[in-house]
Each structure stands twice: as C-alpha cells, then as structure tokens.
Amino acid sequence: MIVMEEIIKKAFIESINNIRRGDKEEELKKIQEKIVNAKKIVVATNNQKKFKVIRDIMLRVCNAEIKMLDIDTRFADLTRMPALTKGLIALDIEKADLYIARGRLGAPGSGSMLVILDEKGRVLTASLSPSSVIHKEDIEERIKKELIEALSRIGISI
C-alpha cells in the first residue's frame, strides 16, 4: 500500500519538473482512506454545541473515538489564520489521526473556515463560509454545512 509521504513526494517531483497536471485519483483515495479509517479524531473546540454537530456527522463517516479539546481556543483569533491555528494547537497537545478545527478565516469580517488536518498537520480538506453578517444562520447549522461540504470536496457523501 502506498503511503501519504510517497504520494506527496511524487507530487512534489512532478511540480518541480513542471509536469503536474492536477490531482490524481490515488491522491484523493488516500485522503478518503485517512478520514474513513481514522480511529481517533480531536475537534479543536471546547464548545459542546459545536462539538456535537461535528461528532454526529463524523460518526456517519467513520468509527472513531471523537474527543473535544479541553482548552479554550479563542486566543487563536489573535492570529492571522485562526481556524488553522486552532487545528495546529490541537495537533500540538493531543495525539490523533485527524484534527477538525473551525474558526475565523483571517481578518475580522473574512468569514469562517472548517479544516480537517491529518496527524502531521497536513490539510486534507476544508470549506469556507461567508461572514455571518451575510449568511445569518445559526452556528450549528453553518458548521454542519461546512463539514458536509469539506467532506464532499473529497468525495465523501453524507
């Protein structure tokens, strides 16, 4: 079985040689496999409502232990990419196969991002939402849509 590092190395070499022409099926399959076969997932939030939405959807995709981060991640809003920072914080303090983080995309007003990272912090998939001023949905509904979209971007249907 080909491992993620080999897939990444091959893609790097193709890019360096200017012969890369988009994603390959084996790359997509490896990402799907990592998500579906995850045994432990850490959700980078200590908000029970957000956690429940993500947990309920992910249990339809994989049979994993899904854990909520037990620290406050609001200080990530002080960084340039809060959602990604939350995921990396989770990676640094908990061992897992996948990390799911959701937060502001960038500058205040930029909207939000939900991102799924692997055990090395590589982005496997993500989705974006406009500012809440535009979409006007409650946070649980928005997170549900973001996670379903992030999964569908890599061919995992809910």
From Swiss-Prot:
InterPro entries: B12-dep_deHydtase_bsu (IPR010254), HcgB (IPR012019). Pfam families: HcgB (PF11576). Coiled coil: none annotated. This is Uncharacterized protein MJ0488. It comes from Methanocaldococcus jannaschii (strain ATCC 43067 / DSM 2661 / JAL-1 / JCM 10045 / NBRC 100440) (Methanococcus jannaschii).
